[in-house]
């Protein structure tokens, strides 16, 4: 296999495209059937399907790491090491006492940053560790990239939360003004790294707001 290069531009493009793909792959199953499941009788089968689509959303950081690694033509070991670091730093897992809880999709901005850092750390460690990379590379990438991702997680949570608050405030104005604001906001979101699908699902958009968001996305 040809050694992947460390150039910045192709790496950034792979991170952006890979994370965009991961958002779609992880969130679309829930987006398609979550409302339908609420309308159905709450049987054991329906509950199981709800669990399945909820867990699928929590795999977003893993999908992102593997897609980015594939786009950068990284080895299986490098890609798997990236996935470890990205999953740990994503915010999907929270610790409460002795329990580990998996919920949500994680913080997409921190996922993107961690995949960017991990892609470089993985490639550099492969070159430096040589024959020992199978033993030490997962640990090195996890500690360095995952550690940096955890340090930046609170900042990224604040940034993403602020954007969500701005969008939520737009739902409290008159329908005409809300339509204009939602069109503008989602036109911005669709060309930004922020997950427009996730924000729309979190707000439960419907009616004028949903139509305006779709119009803004199409216009962008």
Predicted region positions:
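Pore-lining transmembrane helices
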Residues: 1-220
